[in-house]
């Protein structure tokens, strides 16, 4: 059985706090499948509960990841896994690009920027969410650079999930919904069956987060004409 995210008005009000950026349509951009759950699952849950619609652009098939036994073609399985995980998280629209996993930093930033800008337009996003470059690898840094350029061109804010203590960061408290949020996050991560051997470590990391998520701006609303200024 899986647990899926839903939106209820009384719960949505609980997340209309100053700590959560205001958004109607959130686009998450990731380097590889699984990050939408393991890294962004908490913030995406909060946005979904606040009433925002969610979309996802994953730039690679994650074909270089180590896989659990029993799977012969990881690149064929992972797009299906991300669709299942997205459904559990309440993400309504998913695009998976086919850039080479492990080589995102070798693509021209302008090429990745164009792909992200297209997704912003396609899904009418008014906020973009990524993994902060200081918490990921060189692929995540490449995504953050391209997303920054795309957000500036599209005139939408760009938020990043980061770690505590980073300059300019703030915390989002999932509050009473934390237990449900983490259960949904873990259920979505478990949808990536090719990565089942890594699941216990991921669950341990999520458990250590408790009810808190840490975010910071890469492109703040103050840099985007016509956008409301939010925390940070």
What residue spans do the PLM features occupy?
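A conserved beta-strand->alpha-helix junction
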Residues: 59, 87-100
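Flexible loop residues that form catalytic
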Residues: 62, 99, 133
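ATP-dependent adenylation/pyrophosphate-handling site
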Residues: 15, 22-73
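Short, solvent-exposed amphipathic alpha-helices that sit
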Residues: 74-89, 145-150
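Metal-dependent de-N-acetylase/amidase catalytic core
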Residues: 1-29, 93, 102, 106-232
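Short, hinge-like loop/turn segments at secondary-structure boundaries
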Residues: 71-75, 112-114
């Amino acid at each position: 059985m899986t647990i899926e995210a839903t939106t209820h008005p009384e719960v949505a009000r609980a997340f209309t706090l100053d700590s959560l950026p205001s958004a109607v349509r959130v686009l998450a951009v990731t380097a590889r499948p699984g990050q939408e759950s393991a890294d962004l699952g908490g913030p995406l849950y909060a946005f979904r509960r606040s009433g925002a619609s969610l979309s996802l652009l994953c730039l690679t098939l994650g074909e270089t990841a180590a896989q659990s036994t029993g799977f012969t073609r990881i690149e064929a399985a992972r797009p299906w896994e991300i669709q299942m995980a997205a459904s559990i998280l309440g993400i309504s629209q998913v695009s998976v690009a086919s850039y080479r996993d492990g080589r995102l930093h070798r693509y021209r930033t302008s090429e990745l920027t164009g792909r992200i800008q297209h997704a912003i337009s396609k899904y009418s996003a008014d906020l973009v969410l990524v993994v902060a470059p200081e918490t990921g690898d060189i692929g995540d840094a490449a995504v953050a650079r391209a997303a920054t350029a795309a957000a500036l061109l599209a005139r939408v804010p760009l938020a990043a999930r980061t770690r505590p203590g980073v300059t300019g960061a703030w915390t989002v408290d999932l509050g009473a919904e934390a237990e449900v949020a983490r259960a949904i996050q873990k259920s979505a991560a478990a949808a990536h069956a090719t990565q089942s051997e890594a699941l216990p470590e991921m669950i341990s990391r999520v458990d250590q987060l408790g009810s808190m998520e840490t975010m910071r701006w890469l492109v703040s609303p103050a840099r985007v004409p016509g956008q409301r200024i939010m925390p940070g």
